[in-house]
Amino acid sequence: MKVLKFGGTSVGSAQRMKEVAKLITDGERKIVVLSAMSGTTNTLVEISDYLYKKNPEGANEIINRLETKYRQHIDELYATPEYKQKGLELIKSHFDYIRSYTKDLFTLFEEKVVLAQGELISTAMMNYYLQECGVKSVLLPALEYMRTDKNAEPDPVYIKDKLQVQLELHPDAEIYITQGFICRNAYGEVDNLQRGGSDY
C-alpha cells in the first residue's frame, strides 16, 4: 500500500485541500499523512507562549482569530449544509478544547496537546471532504499507533503492529487519512515528533 505525505502548504487552504483530494483518489488504496494547515502550528505555539506567561486574554484573542479563519475554510471546503455543519461542529469542539487550557496550569505536557490540534483538525476536515465526495475514507488516529521510545526515536515494531490493527478495523476503506507530527511517547503521553519528523 502506498503512503503519501502532504505538508502544511499543500493543505493550506480549502482549494488546496480539494487539489490534494483529487490527487489521492485514483482508485488505489493508500495511507495519506497530513500536516496541520500552514501557519497553524506556529499560531498554536504563539497561543502556548501566552499561556506560559499566564496571559489568557492574549491567548483567547489569538484562539478567536484562528477559529474565525477555520470557519471560513469550512465554508469554502464543503458544498452541502450537512457537511458544513459537521465541519463547524468539529472546529468548535477543538477550539473549545484549546480554550479549556486558558483556565489552568500550563506546562510542557499541555503544550504538546495544544500543538497536536492542528493535525487533528486538518485530517478530520479532509476525511469529511472525501466522504462528502463519496470516497470511502477513514480517519486513522496517529495516537493509536505512532509511538517514540525512551530516546524519542520512533518505535518501528510497536508502530507496525498497532498500525496493522488499525488498518484491519477498516478493511473496506479506499483512503486512510492520518496525522503527521503527533505521537505518544514511551510513557503513553501525547507528544510531538520533531518539526519535519512526520517523514518517519
Give a label for each model feature.
Residues 1-200:
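Nucleotide/pyrophosphate-binding catalytic subdomain
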